[in-house]
């Protein structure tokens, strides 16, 4: 029976980043740059891998990570809502409002995840209006 107890201990192995390296020597036209924004994450990495890398970059590995559903989309809640990580596609203004209602201190989105530029700009405004200034896109 004692073998089934989860003590919350995680072991991580140091690996390379989940983000593809950028080749600054190549000249890209505007259309190619726009198309490349969807391919910044390495193919063999999961959203959970990316969530853990975000936690590492923020220095918050001692907080619990849980998967939640917000407005029908899966997000990662770090530290019981301290940070919300949304790596979804088609993020709408309604999705942003639902995340903002959780009152996180920090929010991370996928840069190309917003349904359009208007939704991204409204997200920035919504969080600033609520005093949530730590909003990033990867």
Question: How would you name each of these model-derived features?
Answer:
Residues 1-138:
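Accessory, often C-terminal, charged low-complexity segments
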């Amino acid at each position: 029976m004692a073998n089934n107890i989860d003590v919350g201990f995680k072991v991580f192995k140091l690996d390379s980043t989940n983000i593809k390296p950028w080749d600054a020597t190549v000249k890209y036209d505007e259309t190619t740059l726009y198309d490349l924004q969807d391919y910044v994450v390495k193919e063999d990495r999961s959203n959970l891998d990316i969530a853990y890398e975000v936690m590492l970059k923020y220095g918050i590995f001692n907080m619990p990570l849980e998967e939640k559903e917000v407005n029908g989309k899966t997000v990662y809640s770090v530290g019981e809502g301290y940070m919300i990580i949304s790596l979804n596609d088609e993020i709408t203004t309604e999705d942003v409002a639902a995340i903002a209602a959780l009152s996180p201190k920090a929010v991370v989105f996928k840069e190309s995840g917003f349904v359009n530029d208007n939704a991204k700009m409204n997200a920035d405004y919504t969080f600033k209006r609520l005093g949530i200034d730590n909003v990033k896109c990867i």
